[in-house]
Swiss-Prot record:
Protein name: Solute carrier family 2, facilitated glucose transporter member 4
The gene coding this protein: Slc2a4
Note in the entry: Insulin-stimulated phosphorylation of TBC1D4 is required for GLUT4 translocation.
Functional description taken from the UniProt entry: Insulin-regulated facilitative glucose transporter, which plays a key role in removal of glucose from circulation. Response to insulin is regulated by its intracellular localization: in the absence of insulin, it is efficiently retained intracellularly within storage compartments in muscle and fat cells. Upon insulin stimulation, translocates from these compartments to the cell surface where it transports glucose from the extracellular milieu into the cell.
Cytoplasmic topological domain residue ranges: 1-24, 103-111, 164-171, 223-287, 345-353, 406-417, 467-509
Membrane topology field: Multi-pass membrane protein
Disease note: It is a candidate for certain post-receptor defects in non-insulin-dependent diabetes mellitus.
NCBIfam families: SP
Lineage: Eukaryota, Metazoa, Chordata, Craniata, Vertebrata
Free-text tissue specificity from the UniProt record: Expressed in skeletal and cardiac muscles. Expressed in brown and white adipose tissues.
Start and end residues of each stretch annotated as Interaction with SRFBP1: 7-13
Record's comment on post-translational modification: Sumoylated.
Motif Dileucine internalization motif in this chain: 489-490
Family statement: Belongs to the major facilitator superfamily. Sugar transporter (TC 2.A.1.1) family. Glucose transporter subfamily.
InterPro entries given in the database record: Glc_transpt_4, GLUT, MFS_dom, MFS_sugar_transport-like, MFS_trans_sf, Sugar/inositol_transpt, Sugar_transporter_CS
Length: 509
């Protein structure tokens, strides 16, 4: 009997449709609740910027005492705000190095459960910051929720990738990004002044992140652990068999279990690499460079600058209701993530990434032109909105969801944990740089700031075109062959791969 974890060809050569069980749906939904929180905390800090800055001003004045200045120095306020935004990424940078250790020690499911302690604590601190008259507490809360998000950014794709059926591997993997953008959109809507973006309710707006954390704590115990973790890492055949049965809906999972046994045998022959060994390995240097550059192409594209400071950008463009325009960008973000879900297994990772980079570069140039002409041509404010919407749409077609797919597929089991740590650290470091530095760069460059991103996007496009292989439909042996300078393997007939190969071993390097 075919298992839900295999892709067994039918008589006409077409792969069969595999069952999507209720357990699989519950497990994926429960996992991506973490990604929803990740996105929420990216977007939530934008809309209430003015009222939070007013709170910072009141706190600062209260500490000066009578006879002090009548307002906080602008430089101090800018620094406090930039730190409030960027400390989120510092937490992510630090925790991203712990993904491999925690996922191996606790398992995928229990690691996600334990991670919610950071979410609850961070949300509580942010919610209490105003009452405590302490911007330090808010910044600490942002740090903790960033640490939560750093772990989530690795744990969720790992878990979903290991439980996904083959024919849905790409689509279910992209749901991680979809949950992130939905979280951003929810934060933007709730951040409106007519909702929670007021001087009295903004602490509640920041604290709401506790709710999906509690929901995940409630649902995850009913979900199975990754069968790959149970058998290959923990050597627990009975629990792995039970997990496979729940996920696939089949009574006989012997084929899937045999697949796990074969993978375990290969893993025993492949030496895991430490971080230092990976960095010093000539064999893995090229795929590691590709993995890092693709992460840079995501974060240095300018997308986080748009979401962190979108309200300010729309105000600069002369939009009368910038908060609503920001929500419009969030809707576009969500819609085009759905488009990526539909296209990722059809068009290919490399093609979508190139399309996204090219489109974002064009929109960045258009945005610059619109901002420069705004004073002479007021209608340019509408052009700037179109440019931002297009910028967001092209991001979600390619640079948003694609880089993590490539990282997972470029490396076999031995170097993969270290490679994901390097890629994750690169991603979060750039996130921090943009969050901390964009406001200063924007003040210095004015309307020309997005030309800087256009130049970077062009460079990433050229690199992707010249160096990044297409990985869709190819086995890890074929992908690895491109880095051994034997491209002839890529011309061979592509054999079906399985979702367990998504994070499984391929060869003994």
């Amino acid at each position: 009997m075919p298992s839900g974890f295999q892709q067994i060809g039918s008589e006409d050569g077409e792969p069969p449709q595999q069952r999507v069980t209720g357990t699989l749906v519950l497990a994926v939904f429960s996992a991506v609740l973490g990604s929803l929180q990740f996105g929420y905390n990216i977007g939530v800090i934008n809309a209430p910027q003015k009222v939070i800055e007013q709170s910072y001003n009141a706190t600062w004045l209260g500490r000066q005492g009578p006879g002090g200045p009548d307002s906080i120095p602008q430089g101090t306020l800018t620094t406090l705000w930039a730190l409030s935004v960027a400390i989120f990424s510092v937490g992510g940078m630090i925790s991203s190095f712990l993904i491999g250790i925690i996922s191996q020690w606790l398992g995928r499911k229990r690691a996600m459960l334990a991670n919610n302690v950071l979410a609850v604590l961070g949300g509580a601190l942010m919610g209490l910051a105003n009452a405590a008259a302490s911007y330090e507490i808010l910044i600490l809360g942002r740090f903790l929720i960033g640490a939560y998000s750093g772990l989530t950014s690795g744990l969720v794709p790992m878990y979903v990738g290991e439980i996904a059926p083959t024919h849905l591997r790409g689509a279910l993997g992209t749901l991680n990004q979809l949950a992130i953008v939905i979280g951003i959109l929810v934060a933007q809507v709730l951040g409106l002044e007519s909702m929670l973006g007021t001087a009295t309710l903004w602490p509640l707006l920041l604290a709401i992140t506790v709710l999906p954390a509690l929901l995940q704590l409630l649902l995850l115990p009913f979900c199975p652990e990754s069968p790959r973790y149970l058998y290959i890492i923990r050597n627990l055949e009975g629990p792995a068999r039970k997990s496979l049965k729940r996920l696939t809906g089949w009574a006989d999972v012997s084929d899937a279990l045999a697949e796990l046994k074969d993978e375990k045998r290969k893993l025993e022959r492949e030496r895991p690499l430490s971080l230092l060994q990976l960095l010093g390995s000539r064999t893995h240097r090229q795929p590691l460079i590709i993995a890092v550059v693709l992460q840079l192409s995501q974060q240095l594209s300018g997308i986080n600058a748009v979401f962190y400071y979108s309200t300010s950008i729309f105000e600069l463009a002369g939009v009368e209701q910038p908060a609503y325009a920001t929500i419009g960008a969030g809707v576009v973000n969500t819609v085009f993530t759905l488009v990526s879900v539909l296209l990722v297994e059809r068009a290919g990772r490399r093609t979508l990434h190139l399309l996204g980079l090219a489109g974002m570069c064009g929109c960045a140039i258009l945005m610059t032109v619109a901002l420069l002409l705004l004073e002479r041509v007021p209608s340019m404010s509408y052009v700037s909105i179109v440019a931002i919407f297009g910028f967001v749409a092209f991001f979600e077609i390619g640079p948003g969801p694609i880089p993590w797919f490539i990282v997972a597929e470029l490396f076999s089991q031995g170097p993969r944990p270290a490679a994901m740590a390097v890629a994750g650290f690169s991603n979060w470091t750039c996130n921090f740089i943009v969050g901390m530095g964009f406001q200063y760069v924007a003040d210095a460059m004015g309307p020309y700031v997005f030309l800087l991103f256009a130049v970077l996007l062009l460079g990433f496009f050229i690199f992707t075109f010249l160096r990044v292989p297409e990985t869709r439909g190819r086995t890890f042996d074929q992908i690895s062959a491109t880095f051994r300078r034997t491209p002839s393997l890529l011309e061979q007939e592509v054999k079906p791969s399985t979702e367990l190969e998504y994070l499984g071993p391929d060869e003994n390097d």
